[in-house]
Amino acid sequence: MNDRRSSVFEWLLGDWTLAREISGYATATGVARVFLIDAQTARYEEAVRISLAQGETLSGTQCYLFRREPEAPAKMRILFCSTAELFQSLAFQERGGIWQASARFVCGADQYDSEYILDLQSWQVRHAVRGPRKDYRIETVYRRATGAG
């Protein structure tokens, strides 16, 4: 990464604001924090306020583990917090100053095709979710929290 951090994993550490859209269903805003829990693992925690399309407002939280690949600075794995099972394995490539990775996760009959895009002050995650009863997109934009990073 170009901001003096040596890996994608290290670049993600810190405090973030987030804005999320779940196509046709909801929007969410909130905060996320990525912090080290050991030399190879960071914990991602988010707290959001969700506005459903029908007008109801809820709050929610989510957690993942980010595991670095020590010998490959552009690679990392995302694990579910509750089980430490693999969600997605990412191999970022730099294209014109932007770092991108894509991955797929299959859960039963549902498929999550994901794209991760990082630049110097923000990152995006886009999930296309498809299955027998699912067909929507989840798009989240993260920006460094003021004074962070």
Residue map of PLM features:
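Short terminal or interdomain "cap/linker" segment that borders an active site or interface and mediates
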Residues: 149
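Soluble ligand-binding/transfer domains with enclosed cavities or grooves
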Residues: 2, 6-146
